[in-house]
Amino acid sequence: MVRMFWLLTTFAYLLGSLSFAILLSRLSGRPDPRASGSGNAGATNMLRLAGKKLAILTLLGDLCKGLVPILIASTLSMDIAQQGWIGVCAVLGHLFPVYFRFRGGKGVATAAGVLLGLYPPAAALAIVAWLLTLYLTRTSSLAALIATPLTLPLLAWQEPHALLPMSVLTLLIVWRHRGNLRDLLAGRERHF
C-alpha cells in the first residue's frame, strides 16, 4: 500500500500539472493566461480573457484534477489522511506544473475537487461561501481567501485525520493569493 500511495501522489502531481487554462488558450488561439489579464492560469482569468465557455471548461478540468486522484485513492481503500496528501499533490501540480515551467494557477478549483472527493459537505460549504462572497464583493480572490479556511473547522469536527493535509492545502492557496491580499489591502484588487 505504501508503494501505491507514492504512485498516486506522483500521478496526482502530474495530473494536477495539466493546465486547462493554458491548453484551452492554445487550442483556441487565445493568449497565454499567464501573460494576459490577471496573469493567472485559472478559470477566473479565462472568464475575463476568453469568455464563459472556456472558463467553464477550465473550471471543470481543474476541479477534476483534484477529484479524480481522491476517487482512485478512496477506491483503493486508502485512509482519509493519505487521500488528503494525495490531494495536496494534485494542487501542487496545479500551482507548479512540470509541463509549463512550474508557472501555474492558484489552485482554488483543484482544491474544490479535492474537498469534493474527501468530504462533500466541506466542498459544499466552500462553494456556498465562495459564491456568497463573490456575489457580495464581486472579488474572486477575496471569495477564495474566505471560503478555503472556512472548511477547516468542519473538517476538524467531522474528519480530523484530513485536517493536517487540508491545512497545508489552505496555506498554499493563501500563499498563492499573497499578491491579491496586498491589492485587497491597498484597495486595488480587480472586481467582476
From Swiss-Prot:
A GO MF term: acyl-phosphate glycerol-3-phosphate acyltransferase activity
Signal sequence bounds: none
Subunit composition and interactions: Probably interacts with PlsX.
Pfam family, one: G3P_acyltransf
One GO cellular component, as annotated: plasma membrane
Subcellular location: Cell inner membrane
Keywords assigned: Cell inner membrane, Cell membrane, Lipid biosynthesis, Lipid metabolism, Membrane, Phospholipid biosynthesis, Phospholipid metabolism, Transferase, Transmembrane, Transmembrane helix
Record's keyword annotation contains Cell inner membrane: yes
Topological relation to the membrane, as annotated: Multi-pass membrane protein
Protein name, per record: Glycerol-3-phosphate acyltransferase
Catalytic reaction(s) noted: an acyl phosphate + sn-glycerol 3-phosphate = a 1-acyl-sn-glycero-3-phosphate + phosphate
Species for this entry: Pseudomonas syringae pv. syringae (strain B728a)
Transmembrane segments: 4-24, 54-74, 80-100, 112-132, 154-174
PANTHER family referenced in this protein's UniProt entry, alphabetically: GLYCEROL-3-PHOSPHATE ACYLTRANSFERASE-RELATED, INNER MEMBRANE PROTEIN YGIH
A GO BP annotation: phospholipid biosynthetic process
Entry EC no(s): 2.3.1.275
Role according to the record: Catalyzes the transfer of an acyl group from acyl-phosphate (acyl-PO(4)) to glycerol-3-phosphate (G3P) to form lysophosphatidic acid (LPA). This enzyme utilizes acyl-phosphate as fatty acyl donor, but not acyl-CoA or acyl-ACP.
Annotated family: Belongs to the PlsY family.
SMART domains on file: G3P_acyltransf (SM01207)
Pathway info: Lipid metabolism; phospholipid metabolism
